């Protein structure tokens, strides 16, 4: 992977496991996502579908990507939302996810 020096966006969001492909690296995960919509505002009174706002009032909509470089494991064994710390590299399609 090419190195990039660029600003980061830090946020905490709830991920619906049914729509997140995880690749395990110990306590962290590599997630391939495609961000289709980004909204920075107060949380809506009713959550949209399976996604919810966090305390930072950042709402993301995304879907899993496929790539020949990574083998994805879609883990929905516990059917629970995963609360993660997301570090988003603005010019990449991949984010690093650490469970908190």
Swiss-Prot record:
Keywords: Antimicrobial, Disulfide bond, Fungicide, Plant defense, Secreted, Signal. It comes from Arabidopsis thaliana. It is found in: Secreted. One of its GO terms (cellular component) is extracellular region. Its main location: secreted. The keyword Hydrolase does not apply. Disulfide bonds join 21-84, 43-64, 53-76. One of its GO terms (biological process) is killing of cells of another organism. Residues 1-18 form the signal peptide. This is Defensin-like protein 316. The keyword Signal applies. Belongs to the DEFL family. It comes from the Eukaryota.
